[in-house]
Design a protein with these regions (language model features):
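Sequence/fold signature of self-assembling virion shell proteins
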Residues: 164-291
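Short, glycine/acidic-rich hinge or "gate" loops at secondary-structure transitions
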Residues: 77-95
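Active-site-proximal, glycine-rich beta->alpha crossover segments in alpha/beta enzymes
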Residues: 39-63
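RNA-binding accessory domains that recognize and position tRNA/RNA substrates
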Residues: 68
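Contiguous, amphipathic alpha-helical segments that mediate oligomerization or scaffolding
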Residues: 58, 71, 75-82
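Assembly/oligomerization interface modules of large self-assembling protein complexes
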Residues: 1-47
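Extended, solvent-exposed, turn-rich assembly/linker loops in the middle of proteins
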Residues: 97-178
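Extracellular structured ligand-interaction cores
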Residues: 62, 144, 266
């Protein structure tokens, strides 16, 4: 505001902020080292140059640790996708009471196609899905430059004539979205552009606790966002007395390997971690469930 140069100025009010505390879910996958596997030839082992049991034991230990870390990373991915697509993370498991982390995503950022607006009900030669996408993107708190979708969304989009006419395959490999996908060829497919909007199909899967394979991102979901909106993964303290004693409570992962005496003695491998993805600004994402 304007004021007289002869009058003392007013102190401006600082911008406010809000803080909150969350309790991350705790993980500690565990495997037993089977001694019978140390006396048998392992996969990839040369029959003419067999390794000794000590080598095989170390290979079992490192292999199990690798699997445990991969399982933890898969859970981080699951948490991140759920945070963006539902606005919440549900934490439940053995020995803990179920609780919810609410990221307070605005209601307009979670969209489900209603009757009359469903893409499955539209004329494939006349309907313009690009107009719908622009309306969805307007709900985000910033301009969208990337659209990540499940396989069903991509198949539906390609069925519209107007989409095929404007879909751009020719642009070079310079976008942040495309570079981010470079090493994820098995589960991520960069399809091209729709104007300035990078199009990515994500088909990553994980194995649930009941042994069934499930998609991280459901095939009928699309997510609009901006590649400059980056979150982070926070980690809770390692809740293990050995970690406390050695000053390792702030680690991302805390691997353990020990032998329990007995008849017979049993050896275990375990990895502790308490990860929780934090959306930087969740209102800048829009999720749409197509029908």
């Amino acid at each position: 505001a304007f004021c007289s140069p002869m009058v003392g100025s007013q102190v401006q009010r600082d911008k406010g902020y809000e803080t909150s505390t969350i309790k991350p879910g705790y993980m500690k996958p565990k495997h037993e080292i089977d001694p019978t596997k140390t006396i048998m030839r392992m996969d990839g082992e040369d029959p003419a140059q067999l390794n000794d049991p000590t080598y095989r034991r170390m290979r079992l230990i490192t292999g199990n640790m690798r699997r445990q870390i991969n399982a933890i990373k898969a859970r981080v991915e699951w948490l991140a996708v759920n945070a963006v697509t539902t606005g919440k993370n549900i934490i439940e498991g053995e020995g803990i009471e179920r609780y919810e982390i609410d990221w307070k995503i605005p209601e307009n950022c979670i969209i489900q196609q209603a009757s009359g607006k469903k893409w499955s009900q539209q004329d494939k030669d006349m309907h313009d899905p690009i107009y719908d996408i622009e309306l969805y993107a307007d709900q985000a708190g910033c301009p969208a430059n990337v659209m990540i979708m499940g396989g069903e969304v991509w198949r539906t989009l390609r069925s519209f004539k107007k989409f095929r006419e404007l879909y751009d395959l020719s642009r070079g490999s310079e976008s942040a979205a495309e570079l981010a996908c470079k090493n994820l060829g098995e589960v991520v497919s960069f399809k091209g552009y729709l104007g300035d909007l990078a199009l990515i199909v994500y088909s990553g899967k994980y194995t649930d606790s009941d042994g069934t394979e499930k998609y991280f991102l459901e095939p009928d979901l699309l997510v609009l966002g901006n590649t400059n909106n980056k979150g982070l993964v926070a980690y809770g303290a390692i809740m293990d007395q050995e970690a406390v004693r050695t000053g390792a409570t702030q680690n991302m992962y805390y691997p353990k390997n020990w032998i329990e005496d007995g008849d017979p003695a049993i050896e275990y491998v375990q990895t502790h971690s308490a990860p929780q993805p934090i959306p930087a600004d969740i209102r800048k994402f829009v999720t749409v469930k197509i029908a």
